[in-house]
Structures are given as C-alpha cells and as structure tokens.
C-alpha cells in the first residue's frame, strides 16, 4: 500500500514512485513523479521473498534513468530555490485522512 509515500505527500513533498502496484490508487502524474514500468520479475530478495509466488516491478536501465531524471529535476528546483510545496499531493492525502477513512467505514458497516 505504501503508507510512507502517502505520508510524504501529506507533508507536501515531491515524491517519486513507480506507476505500478497499490500506490497507484493515490499517485498520479499530477501529484507524483512516476517511473513507468515495462516489465515484471519474480519477487526475490533472499530474505522475505524467495521466488515461489508473485512478481514485482522490474527496475531496468530505463527505470533507473527515469529515477535519476526525477531526482535531478527535484534537486535542481531546490538548488534554484524554486521547490514549492506539492499542493496536489497534499490535496490527495486529505482523501485518506483518519476522518474520511472513519466516515467510509461507518458508511459500509
């Protein structure tokens, strides 16, 4: 779900995320710097995921280039004193406030 990403958005930070998986429920081109995923690979990290089930986004050279580009763009804005709050991200995060979440739960319970 990537709650940490949503928390950063609530703080108005400029976030970088893949355009893949659960966080696409709240991340889009208006509120995040997205990395386009072209392929998936077997989920294996040698600790928790051992390749038996599931796939995750493959980070190949093109995705690393996108990540570097997004990082450079954000850093350049900061260096030039042009980095502002990400108001689109803040607005998005309000949809997932505790108040709104509680109201949705009450509505369906």
Name each model-derived stretch.
Residues 14-17, 33-34:
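Short hydrophobic beta-strand element within catalytic cores of glycosyltransferases
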Residues 8-9, 71:
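Methionine-biased hydrophobic packing positions in alpha-helices, especially
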Residues 5-6, 24, 93, 106:
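Short amphipathic alpha-helical segments and helix-helix/interface helices
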Residues 17-21, 25:
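Classical protein tyrosine phosphatase
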Residues 2-5, 20:
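Short glycine/serine-rich donor-binding loops of glycosyltransferases
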Residues 7-8, 16:
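Short hydrophobic faces within alpha-helices
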Residues 58-69, 76-107:
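A charged, aromatic-enriched C-terminal amphipathic alpha-helix characteristic of glycosyltransferases
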